[in-house]
């Protein structure tokens, strides 16, 4: 695979969407609002726990995992939400994983994928997602706004992912309430936790912010805790020998 990860992935997504049929809308799964929950739990750094079998940068992470049991452990140990990778080609995920997990937990679930079309959003909702991911770097601002409005119009929440100041300002302009700062550059897939620290100077009081990627330890979590409502962690949890203990380590009391 090319080192230009994002363009390669988006090219594949365009092919997938072209072959994708429109699904009839199914009822929205009932759970709490992630935005309201993160706002109300600001005294503790919250955890968005991810189910991820593989990635383009690391290759296979944990192919043997029981995805439902992993998700149940996340919920039992206090995760605010479960993120589920559904990309098949690059992350070895599947929409069925989202469907299975969403049917077995009561907390919000995020469809973690590269969404570029309304058809994907309907499929995500039908599979049990209550939140979808939109990546600023993957879309024009006009298209980002269209997909954001479409998703929220269906009762879904949206995690809008950014990586630099220009993208953060775009997320603010479209009215995003839940904003992620990805410490991973989606072109090179290199990570730097300083991305979160630098962008935190530009946050707005009425939004909630999630630091994503490059968080493996208590020390990493403590670095971002003063500025963020939550962290999104995948690899560290998927590789942990004791998932419950790892979650306990990453949940930081902000006083």
Curated annotation (Swiss-Prot):
Protein name in UniProt: Indole-3-glycerol phosphate synthase
NCBIfam families according to UniProt: PRK00278.1-3 (NF001371), PRK00278.2-4 (NF001377)
Keywords: Amino-acid biosynthesis, Aromatic amino acid biosynthesis, Decarboxylase, Lyase, Tryptophan biosynthesis
Species of the source: Streptococcus gordonii (strain Challis / ATCC 35105 / BCRC 15272 / CH1 / DL1 / V288)
Top EC group: lyase
Secretion signal span: none
Species lineage: Bacteria, Bacillati, Bacillota, Bacilli, Lactobacillales
Stated family: Belongs to the TrpC family.
Domain of life: Bacteria
Coiled-coil parts of chain: none
Molecular function per GO: indole-3-glycerol-phosphate synthase activity; phosphoribosylanthranilate isomerase activity
Reaction equations catalysed: 1-(2-carboxyphenylamino)-1-deoxy-D-ribulose 5-phosphate + H(+) = (1S,2R)-1-C-(indol-3-yl)glycerol 3-phosphate + CO2 + H2O
Pathway where this protein functions: Amino-acid biosynthesis; L-tryptophan biosynthesis; L-tryptophan from chorismate: step 4/5
GO biological process, one term: L-tryptophan biosynthetic process
PANTHER family in the cross-refs: INDOLE-3-GLYCEROL-PHOSPHATE SYNTHASE, TRYPTOPHAN BIOSYNTHESIS PROTEIN
UniProt KW NAD keyword: no
Enzyme Commission number, as recorded: 4.1.1.48
């Amino acid at each position: 695979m090319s080192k230009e990860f994002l363009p390669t992935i988006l090219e594949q997504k365009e092919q997938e969407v072209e072959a994708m049929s429109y699904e009839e809308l199914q009822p929205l799964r009932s759970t709490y609002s992630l935005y309201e929950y993160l706002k109300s739990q600001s005294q503790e750094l919250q955890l968005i726990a991810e189910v991820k079998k593989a990635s383009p940068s690391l290759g296979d992470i944990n192919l043997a995992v029981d995805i439902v049991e992993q998700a149940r452990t996340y919920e039992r140990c206090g995760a605010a939400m479960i993120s589920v990778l559904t990309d098949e080609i690059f992350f070895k995920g599947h929409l069925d994983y989202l469907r299975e997990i969403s049917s077995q937990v009561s907390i919000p679930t995020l469809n973690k994928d590269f969404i570029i079309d309304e058809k994907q959003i309907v499929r995500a909702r039908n599979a049990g997602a209550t939140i979808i991911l939109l990546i600023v770097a993957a879309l024009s601002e006009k298209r980002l706004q269209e997909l954001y409005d479409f998703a929220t119009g269906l009762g879904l929440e949206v995690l809008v992912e950014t990586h630099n100041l220009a993208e953060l300002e775009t997320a603010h302009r479209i009215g995003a309430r839940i904003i992620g700062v990805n410490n991973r550059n989606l072109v090179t897939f290199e990570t730097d936790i300083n991305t979160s620290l630098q962008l935190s100077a530009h946050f707005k009081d009425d939004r909630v912010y999630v630091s994503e990627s490059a968080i493996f330890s208590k020390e990493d979590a403590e670095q971002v805790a003063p500025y963020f409502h939550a962290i999104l962690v995948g690899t560290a949890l998927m590789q942990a020998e004791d998932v419950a203990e790892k979650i306990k380590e990453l949940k930081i009391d902000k006083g």
